[in-house]
A protein has these predicted regions:
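Short active-site loop/helix that positions an aromatic residue
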Residues: 1, 127-136
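Non-catalytic accessory segments of DNA primases and related replication-initiation nucleases
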Residues: 1-49
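Serine endopeptidase catalytic core focused on the charge-relay Asp
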Residues: 44-56, 80
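Active-site-proximal, Lys/Arg-enriched surface segment
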Residues: 55-76, 100-107
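Short acidic-glycine loop/turn motifs at beta-strand connectors
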Residues: 78-83, 90
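Glycine-/acidic-rich phosphate or pyrophosphate-binding loops and their flanking alpha/beta elements
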Residues: 95-116
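TOPRIM fold recognition
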Residues: 115-116, 132-206
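Helix N-cap/beta->alpha junction signal
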Residues: 122-123, 172
Length: 206
């Protein structure tokens, strides 16, 4: 990694984001889930339980890229432009959903303010997990770790390929295989387990 994680998050917050398409409309009805009052204890417990270091969770919260909603106590990952959010349940019942202003929006985190490669994952927790795995392996480089909220979001993949070299890093399952076949011209990175968070857990809890 070319800079500390703190510096990387600061760089992310100063980054102006990926260029917008000139033809996109504005004013689309969109709202983020209501934010709970800190300290977001359910989100912190959930993500640290998934192998994400407390330092990483707290930095994402501090930089307004992650919060806990109310009344459901979900984890909400918010894109820097606030036009996309990914909602992850923190309770015993699994829940994963997205809200976005336009269909091609996405969540991302950078390891450098001038990314040279975008690693495209299915979920924000997997994007963060892959970033942490690369950090352990010493291969973060100048990268953006992106969540598209599911492999059906082909418009986002197409948009990203017009901005940066893309590596498909979607799940190791049938839907991921379909996505790789659909984008056969793109390089791929496939998790050993079902997804990158499972791979991270295998590293931190051998």
């Amino acid at each position: 990694m070319n800079c500390s994680f703190t510096a990387a998050v600061n760089a992310l917050c100063k980054f102006n984001g990926f260029p917008r398409d000139k033809t996109e409309a504005t004013g689309t009805l969109f709202c983020l889930p209501e934010k709970a009052d800190p300290p977001f204890s359910h989100v912190i417990a959930y993500l640290t339980g998934r192998g994400i270091p407390l330092e990483t969770v707290m930095l994402l919260i501090h930089e307004d890229l992650l919060y806990q909603d109310t009344p459901h106590k979900n984890a909400v990952f918010v894109s820097p432009d606030k036009e996309y959010c990914e909602i992850r349940g923190t309770g015993s019942k699994s829940f994963h959903g997205c809200r976005k202003k336009k269909s091609d929006r996405f969540w991302y985190i950078l390891t450098d303010p001038k990314p040279e490669t975008a690693y495209v994952c299915e979920a924000a927790i997997d994007a963060v997990s892959l970033m942490l795995i690369h950090k352990v392996q010493g291969m973060n480089g100048h990268a953006a770790y992106v969540s598209i909220g599911g492999v059906a979001n082909q418009r986002t993949i197409d948009r990203l390929t017009n901005k940066l070299p893309v590596v498909l890093a979607v799940d190791n399952d049938s839907a991921g295989n379909d996505c790789r076949r659909r984008n056969a011209d793109l390089p791929t990175l496939i998790p050993h387990n079902k997804d990158w968070n499972d791979d991270l857990l295998e590293i931190v809890r051998p």
